[in-house]
Curated annotation (Swiss-Prot):
Compartmental location: Cell inner membrane
NCBIfam families: PRK14225.1
An annotated GO BP: cellular detoxification of fluoride
Identification of the protein by name: Fluoride-specific ion channel FluC 3
Reactions that this protein is recorded to catalyse: fluoride(in) = fluoride(out)
Amino acid sequence: MRNWRQAENIRLYIAVGCGAAIGALLRFLSGWVIVAILGANPLWGTSFVNIVGSFIIMFFATLTGPEGRWLVSPAWRQFVMGGLCGGLTTFSSMSLDTFLLVLHGNAAFALAYLCGLVFLSLSAAMLGLIAAQRINR
């Protein structure tokens, strides 16, 4: 019994690690596209991945939860929610961006950025919930 649990834990660790690697790569590529190709401010890259990640995690959590239509293993849930979304989203970059704005004399914009990003991320999560609930019907 103990060996089975250890094997299951190893599967979860691998799932989270693989998902996190993919999520981090997607975050990097998203930021690169937004800054290098579109010429936008790096704040848009941080905002984009946090908003998209909020939608994905709620959408997937609702579809694969107890009343969800999709039956997936715990490893798949961890791959998507803990790994992919965890690697994609970035609270630390949002914090850094906010403090850099304050340090450069843009405190009002920093507050607007922070409040706006939290609002939009929560709104995206709500849209993910609504979309998944419609599929679950």
